[in-house]
Amino acid sequence: LVANATGCSSIYGGNLPTTPWAKNKDGRGPAWSNSLFEDNAEFGLGMRITADKQLAVARQLLQELKDELGEAYVKEILDAPQTLESELVTQHQRVDGLKAKLKDMHSSKAAHLLSVADQLVRRSVWLVGGDGWAYDIGYGGLDHALASGRNINILVLDTEVYSNTGGQSSKSTPTAATAKFAAGGKSGGKKDLAMQAISYGNVYVARVAFGANPQQALLAMREAEAHDGPSIILAYSHCIAHGYDLKNGLDQQHKAVASG
């Protein structure tokens, strides 16, 4: 489940006929949704709370039907590991079998479980947006989402300027950087969102730059997904507002990391 804040990522990620959000041969893939700029964190947190509630309902109904379905069969579904992709595929197959059984059962509980059975497969929730959302306009909601302790993943595409409105200086812009409204160089410092998240003690935090180290970026994504709790990845992102040809974007990421 993807909650995408309005901004550059929603424009290039949400327009047809091309889209980065794809489904596999079984018709399964990410469910993408776009929220307002200022409340995307709350929007994504709501997805997590809803998924958790529906899972609790499904598990309760499955327990109540263990006499009809078989206690061992119910236990297999409830206790199934769902960390690796292969384990999720197997759980999908279990749930498909469960739904086939439920269709032949004529009771209100079976019908109710059939409507929520898909929730027995683990849901991954990602909140995606830029630094204008995460560092500034949507920061209050983002902080609330991190403090909730819920199993959410946050990906911040950090260009260090307000990209969607033309490249203005923002709270993410580092000291002395030149941008619109800071032509002589920004006098203040860059907001340290990573340290603020770390202060909670239960949040997974990573900084990545795909162009500088793609292996580390992939590892951070996997670790964030595996962390049972809030996670946030601050991904340095190149942007047309930086003033260079974007065909050199990955090289610029490498230079940015090398320069500190």
Residue ranges and their predicted role:
Residues 18-35, 143-144, 149-153, 177-180, ...:
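Extended active-site and interfacial segments that coordinate phosphate-rich ligands
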